[in-house]
Amino acid sequence: MDDRPVEVWYPVEPTAVEGQSPEIFDSINVISEVLRPLIPGDLGGEIDTGAYRDAPPATASGPFPTAAYSHGSPGYRQAATFMTGHLASHGVITIAVEHLGRSLSTLLTPLAGADTPEDDVTDLLNALDLVGSDLGLGAVVDTSRMVVIGHSAGARTAALATADDRVVGVALLAGVPQELASNRPALVVAFENDALIDPASIWSLHQSIDNSVFVNIAGTGHAAPIDACPLIQDRGGLTELREALGAAVVRAGEDGCLPGDTDARAVQDLLRIYITGFVYEALGLLSGPLNLTAETADLVAGVELRGFNESPAVPLGDG
């Protein structure tokens, strides 16, 4: 878009990228230029996205339905390539717009906090229209139906986006409590040790939705569904960033990503299964009924559920 970047992941034919290397993304490149000089040089974290930039889109199986990812605060559009790229590899074109008002790239700049929740929804829907009119992708994308996946503040964007008839379902990950604008199927995910959003409030949101699945993942926290979490866990936290970013931002970035937390890679593997299954069901891509159950977690070693469609046993303090 003219005033902010949009990222799009889409299916490609394996032969079209044969011999090429997938894109490597370093999260330090999205940190605000105001802060970048204060960041130690060894704190960059390279992530193999598994995606190939500017590859020709697959055409044989299209048109492909759509999902959108709305990042948290502060966050960035490439924060969850473990999920966005995975969806694209399973036939779902996935869009992510940079919400400049809550972007890591605008932290401590005049743009920070400038956008309203309604602005964020407008940006997301404008990005959908942009992809639909794109010369390369327009012929292979189905923009008539979309699932919106929101993390933290992005869950509010997802919930409000249900006012648009094209949004057929939402996945809300550690989401700020926000009622849906219109009733839609929902996957509602809480993280047991979330220090920012009380799982009990997420449970209450789940109860307010007619068709909703509630998943509470054990031993992890708020930042589990971002690419950087396993890297943060590997290095033992983000202590070196406290002076540059402030203690509150660092605590939020570490939440669920410290060595004592559940293995972040296992958590993300489990999220891929639940989210992809839900997206397939909401978009009508399944030939039969989807059976997302507590036993689904048994498919991934090293991670457990604290509850499935069950109230958190001991409510945490206010986040």
Features from the language model and the residues they span:
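Domain-level recognition of soluble alpha/beta enzyme cores
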Residues: 1-66, 252-262
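Short substrate-entry loop that stabilizes the transition state in hydrolases
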Residues: 47-64, 69-106, 195-198
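Alpha/beta-hydrolase active-site loop
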Residues: 79-82, 89, 112-143, 160-162
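A conserved short beta-strand
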Residues: 97, 165-176, 184-185
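Gly/Ala-rich beta-loop-alpha elbow adjacent to hydrolase catalytic centers
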Residues: 149-154, 158
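Short beta-strand/loop motif that positions the catalytic acidic residue
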Residues: 188-190, 194
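Conserved alpha/beta-hydrolase "acid-adjacent" motif
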Residues: 195-201, 224-225
